[in-house]
Amino acid sequence: MVITLLNLNKKHYLLILFFILLNGCSIDKNIILNKKQKQHKIFNLPITHTSKETHNFNYQDNKQSNNNYLEPLFEDYKPRNVGDILTIILQENTSASNSVSNNSIHNGNSNFDIDIGNARAFDDPNGILNKIELNSSIKNNFLGKGSSSANNTFVGLITVIVDRILPNGNLEVSGSKNITINDGIEKICFYGIVNPHTISKNNSVLSTKVANTNITYISSGPINIGSKINWLQRLFVSLFTLSK
């Protein structure tokens, strides 16, 4: 065997090396089946997401799941199956402003003349009643202005799960995160449609590149309660608004 290897030239060595590398790009069928069974055990639980439907991750019954679980040696990992995870980089920054101005001026004048005729019949030698003139004028000015502005910034990270694979290959993802700090609870929910081509090599995607995005942020605790006005203050605010 040693003599045979020594008699091989460089071309034969390159050919052997090529087949070794080619073997590294393939996986045994038994490994694939074992991987499917492990994933089936992990994800065969009903999980509630932010979407309206509750999905049961059963790979054997889900016809929309891609059965290709091969992970090539020279390819970056990207989610391509139901149950795969994906990191969403939240970078939402919205700004809106509105300004309204209305200026209305209305002027009106009216003249009304009455010619009585012979002033002597009314015992008016000076002719005061000879002609009576009535004048009236109306002037109405209205000036109104209004403006509003809003700025919202949302930055963070959340990891979501692929719920469904659309016919065109896009991924429907959703996920939630609960954070408890002292007595305060913060919950972030995310839902959207991800194009696999926008996923980076580190398995993340910007929230600005996700379609049909639905981001919900809910906070509860002493700080949230303290920021709300009580019923008595709301009553005074309502009365003050009606008095205007």
From Swiss-Prot:
Determine if Manganese is one of this entry's keywords. no
Lipid anchor positions (S-diacylglycerol cysteine)? 25
Q: Residues with N-palmitoyl cysteine lipidation?
A: 25
Q: What is this protein called?
A: Flagellar L-ring protein
Q: Which keywords are on file for this protein?
A: Bacterial flagellum, Cell membrane, Lipoprotein, Membrane, Palmitate, Signal
Family (UniProt): Belongs to the FlgH family.
Q: What does the subunit comment say?
A: The basal body constitutes a major portion of the flagellar organelle and consists of four rings (L,P,S, and M) mounted on a central rod.
Q: Which residues does UniProt assign to the signal peptide?
A: 1-24
The answer to whether the entry has keyword Signal is yes
Role this protein plays: Assembles around the rod to form the L-ring and probably protects the motor/basal body from shearing forces during rotation.
Q: One MF term in GO for this entry?
A: cytoskeletal motor activity
- Annotated GO biological process: bacterial-type flagellum-dependent cell motility
Q: Where in the cell is it found?
A: Cell membrane; Bacterial flagellum basal body
Which InterPro entries is this protein grouped with?
Answer: Flag_Lring
What are the cysteine partners in each disulfide bond? none
